């Protein structure tokens, strides 16, 4: 797709997909942009603008066919493809990710987990998933065609791991380390502490 899609649009696209999934479960066949906006606390014009990046989906005065739009957005998001992942870092976060079974149900299959700690190497991190030495990371990624790397290492090691993953052919990175990493592949940063700070700010502001 030639046109560059703003990152906020991609995030909202995921919300649209999940909302449409719920609508299908409810047996809804047609939905308007106004109803989607109400459910997602957005403006209908924003939804229409976001969807226009990818083509024409609805009819003015009629709305969107829920199943058709759900399938179309799913295709855009790559949900029908099974994605291979590796986790680097077998600490609490890394093991939690490896044991999150919902990921496999949604098409994300973790096929390897790596660490540099000798006390963790060779131990089971999740059912059927044994911790490997991080020195084997590049070879594993290349041999298995891994597409997504999950970084769950201390901040001081995150950039190095990201660069190694990129050189090995990783297509995207999910970063749990509390530091921004710089690589040419797409990166999604998950900073739990930062999110909690935003939450506490809202709590304090609401109760002041």
Swiss-Prot record:
Q: Where in the cell is it found?
A: Cytoplasm
Q: GO molecular function of the protein, one example?
A: DNA-binding transcription factor activity
Reading the lineage from the top rank, the first entry is Bacteria
Q: Which InterPro entries match?
A: CoA-bd (IPR003781), NAD(P)-bd_dom_sf (IPR036291), Rex_DNA-bd_C_dom (IPR009718), Tscrpt_rep_Rex (IPR022876), WH-like_DNA-bd_sf (IPR036388), WH_DNA-bd_sf (IPR036390)
DNA-binding region boundaries: 15-54
Q: List keywords of the entry alphabetically.
A: Cytoplasm, DNA-binding, NAD, Repressor, Transcription, Transcription regulation
Q: Where is NAD(+) bound in this sequence?
A: 89-94
**Entry keyword Thylakoid:** no
Major site of localization recorded for this protein: cytoplasm
Q: Does the keyword NAD apply?
A: yes
Q: Name one GO cellular component term.
A: cytoplasm
Please list the GO biological process terms of this entry: negative regulation of DNA-templated transcription; response to redox state
How this chain assembles, per its entry, is:
Homodimer.
List the NCBIfam families.
PRK05472.1-3, PRK05472.2-2, PRK05472.2-3, PRK05472.2-4, PRK05472.2-5
PANTHER family from the entry? REDOX-SENSING TRANSCRIPTIONAL REPRESSOR REX, REDOX-SENSING TRANSCRIPTIONAL REPRESSOR REX 1
Please describe what this protein does: Modulates transcription in response to changes in cellular NADH/NAD(+) redox state.
The similarity comment for this entry is: Belongs to the transcriptional regulatory Rex family.
State the protein's name. Redox-sensing transcriptional repressor Rex 1
